[in-house]
Amino acid sequence: MKEQTEVGKLKEGKYLLVDDEPCKILSISVSKPGKHGAAKARLDVVGIFDGVKRSIVQPVSAKVYAPIVERRNAQVISIAGNVVQMMDLESFENFEVTVTDDVKDRIEAGKETMYIYSMEKRKIDFL
């Protein structure tokens, strides 16, 4: 799910869709409007799920999409290799998430953890 917004209304720490990937905004710099053009905004973002840094330049009045990012709670059912099977505590839906070794060391079966859900993707989140 996504919603439309203007580049000028975005703030650091919010989310933005870049190349159909939900990204967190790290920094925004806005140039002054010139004699023959509108103000431009440079956004430095990092992908939530892939960790890739991206940079885009858009006019401040341009329309962009902001993904709806939800933080939900789930119970870890089992851990097999780098795949963690989890159950959402609200909808009782079972799903699998691929994790890295450092995340795998911080979770254990039977415990509750928080995860990020956006654009039909999931990732375990530690605050």
Curated annotation (Swiss-Prot):
Entry-linked SMART domains: eIF-5a
Subcellular location as annotated: Cytoplasm
Function comment: Functions by promoting the formation of the first peptide bond.
The protein's name: Translation initiation factor 5A
Annotated positions of the Hypusine modification: K35
Listed SUPFAM superfamilies: Nucleic acid-binding proteins (SSF50249), Translation proteins SH3-like domain (SSF50104)
Gene3D superfamilies in the record: 2.30.30.30, Nucleic acid-binding proteins (2.40.50.140)
